[in-house]
């Protein structure tokens, strides 16, 4: 009887392990096929060297292989060539570990996790090992907190590490920002997004190309909790979410947008799709919006299909383009403004 029970336990464990090793990261078949196609195109574009050698590792689980395929399919070419496959595999495993360990991990939809937790890159910073470092520092600080309180706590931690200082150099990496202890808004928001993702909280950097009220721009953070996106100033802790010094300027802004890693099919308006990212319009998180229908006609009164339409705001003594659309057959696509 003991032998039978032991065999039954071993069999059950084997089944569980088999199921875990064969669980999909990309659960939707049509999306999985699209990612596989984009990945093959990336491989064909980079046929030399051993840039994709990590995929030859027979020990990779289905989950790990698909997560790596997603990252490689849409990462910039420089990220393929500059960092080894083991680096990306470690980050895949860390993100999964965090999702399994954090109480909110199971609440995050797969699509949200895929685009706003797994990706390492936020802006044009150098990539580093911040996910592991930040997780080790933050896991006990957010332990037992509801998700929204955890977001606030992470931002308090970020404020302890980095303060604002203007600069014009390339965006510093998250660990470099900790070392210098300062950064401009784009660096503070890159750092904060990395910290939130390190503890499994979906986050994205939001940017307004130009303000309507003053000659400047700004970047901050949105984090996902309980089915909604909330905004706040990076390294600028407040007692609640959706509160920052920029509430009023953002309510008058012409555009707030973010670049999402990979092919993204979320509810927001898609402004631009590239081989690496999807640019989306998040203005409605800050102000009432409406559709502006622009018609372009030739001298005969006929619609000019494909005509380029630029939406501009006056800033720095010039009309600055914040969004570009083109005339389509189905309808003249509108840009959402407040």
Model-derived features with residue positions:
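Hydrophobic/aromatic-rich core segments of domains that either
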Residues: 140-141, 145, 150-156, 165-175, ...
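Extracellular ectodomain segments of secreted/surface proteins
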Residues: 266-293
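A short, amphipathic beta-strand motif
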Residues: 290-298, 330
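Single conserved hydrophobic/aromatic residue that forms the stacking wall/gate
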Residues: 331-338
């Amino acid at each position: 009887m003991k032998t039978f029970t032991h065999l039954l336990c071993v069999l059950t464990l084997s089944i569980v392990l088999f199921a875990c090793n064969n669980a999909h990261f990309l659960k939707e078949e049509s999306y999985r096929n699209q990612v596989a196609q984009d990945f093959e195109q990336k491989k064909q574009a980079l046929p030399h060297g051993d840039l994709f050698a990590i995929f030859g590792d027979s020990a990779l689980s289905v989950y790990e292989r698909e997560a790596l395929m997603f990252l490689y399919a849409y990462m910039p070419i420089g990220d393929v060539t500059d960092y080894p496959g083991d680096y990306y595999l470690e980050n895949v495993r860390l993100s999964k570990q965090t999702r399994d360990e954090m109480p909110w991990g199971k609440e995050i939809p797969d699509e949200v996790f895929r685009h706003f937790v797994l990706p390492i890159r936020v802006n044009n910073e150098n990539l580093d090992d911040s996910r592991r470092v930040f997780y080790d520092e933050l896991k006990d600080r957010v332990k037992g907190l509801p998700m929204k309180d955890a977001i606030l706590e992470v931002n308090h931690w970020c404020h302890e590490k980095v303060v604002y200082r203007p600069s014009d150099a390339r965006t510093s990496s998250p660990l470099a920002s900790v070392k210098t202890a300062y950064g401009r808004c784009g660096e503070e928001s890159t750092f904060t997004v990395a910290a939130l993702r390190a503890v499994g909280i979906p986050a994205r950097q939001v940017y307004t190309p130009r303000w309507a009220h003053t000659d400047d721009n700004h970047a901050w953070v949105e984090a996902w909790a309980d089915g909604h996106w909330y905004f706040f100033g990076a390294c600028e802790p407040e007692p609640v979410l959706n509160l920052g010094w920029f509430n009023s300027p953002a309510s008058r802004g012409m555009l707030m947008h973010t670049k999402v890693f990979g092919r993204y099919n979320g509810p927001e308006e898609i402004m631009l799709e590239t081989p690496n990212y999807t640019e989306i319009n998040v203005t409605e998180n800050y102000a009432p919006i409406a559709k502006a229908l622009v018609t372009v006609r030739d001298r005969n009164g006929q619609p000019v299909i494909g005509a380029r339409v630029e939406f501009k705001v006056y800033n720095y003594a010039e009309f600055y383009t914040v969004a570009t659309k083109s005339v389509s057959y189905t309808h003249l696509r509108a840009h959402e403004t407040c």
